[in-house]
Amino acid sequence: MDVLKKTPVREQDPKVRATNFEEVCLGYNREEAMEEASRCINCKNAQCIKGCPVSINIPGFIEKVKNGDVEGAYQVISESSALPAVCGRVCPQESQCEGKCIRGIKGEPVSIGKLERFVADSAREAGIKPQGAEKKNGKKVAVIGSGPAGLTCAGDLARMGYEVTIFEALHEPGGVLVYGIPEVRLPKTKVVAKEIENVKSLGVKIETNVVVGKSVTIDELLEEEGYDAVFIGSGAGLPKFMGIPGEQANGVFSANEYLTRSNLMKAFCEDSNTPIMHGKKVAVVGGGNVAMDAARTALRLGAEVHIVYRRSEEELPARVEEVHHAKEEGIIFDLLTNPVEILEDEKGWVNGIRCIKMELGEPDESGRRRPVEVPGSEFVIDVDTVIMSLGTSPNPLISSTTKGLEINKRKCIIAEEDCGKTTKEGVYAGGDAVTGAATVILAMGAGKTAAKGIDEYLSNK
């Protein structure tokens, strides 16, 4: 065993997985996990914990894995995380916990994410559940949204003894975990549904098909329904577009809609209740994880897929692992390329996308070099479907129906970073509804912070 290198993790063969929706990464078995855990040197001042947005005791759980104590490892993790099987799969560990790992200075960091996944999966298979509160405190909290922020906040509050009800607008709980991330990265029945069951086992109730702002307002929850506090974790589901000619053509989707139709509605299957055509040649505009998810989904539906991104590969915001998997599967990357027009036929259907070549200039406000058009470099990519993956912003329904709840110029709810408190008394918020589109783990961290803020508020009320 070379302690400087990670224990390899098994994956589906790229040629095989490109034709199915089964999970790509197969994870560690017990022997592999214990071998990888033995690489951890159990630092006294563990920087990996500081790199984790929910502050999991990483050396603590890894030590238990090394000793074969899966249940003990799970209880250590579940003290900090309500969704370990999710985080072990989709967190950007390379820039967080693993990015801080001391092992990474002279070799490869410990595979913290893969070990977390192993523990969560093993606990699920053994029927191990997180430990809940011994007794309730008699206070009620409403949580809006059942995505990662809402589930985390609800789980933490339930552990503190609160009676918690989650209100979800869709017919299935899970938020972006269900509609946004494809099965190839995050299985829905085997993983997401079980994680939600674990949160419910803590005493959390979930009501679906409740659109807060229409079905019921926040003021009504506080004044008429008897809730002592409200947490808003409704995410950011309003897609952004470029504003170029042709965006209204048939065959143009936001990534949000495309993935929801595929993941939640199965609309690209012929026997679906809401079937729609899926393209043979698809362009996905954008370079984040959502763009990779949309591209890899389109590939599995039989399309030739192009990722169209205006910067170079170094600036791609997607995880290195996701880019690597996409390339392995045969997705074409048109880098330093920017769309200027979506072309359509006489019936209004997409039949191409006109692009222009770019070069990188001086850094912009994000710190990345600004892309500049190369004059006279326009060309057309032959496609019949265009998926726009340019980010999302919060839906204004909640903010527009709640008196005293202030938003910023980006339409995001204003909340204090250290406690989640909004401008309306008794109302807290976190996740994408506050920050705009970000990662699952950052939303979880915000939900955890807000739970502490709510507990402090109600304890002193």
What label would you give each PLM region?
Residues 17-36, 57-89, 106-134, 262-263:
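Ferredoxin-type iron-sulfur electron-transfer modules in oxidoreductases and energy-metabolism complexes
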Residues 72, 135-136, 140-144, 196-244, ...:
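Feature captures the FAD/FMN-dependent oxidoreductase FAD-binding
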Residues 119-135, 192-214, 239-301, 408-418, ...:
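Glycine-rich dinucleotide-binding loop and its adjacent helix/turn
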Residues 163-166, 170-201, 206-207, 295-341:
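Rossmann-like dinucleotide-binding cores of NAD(P)H-dependent redox enzymes
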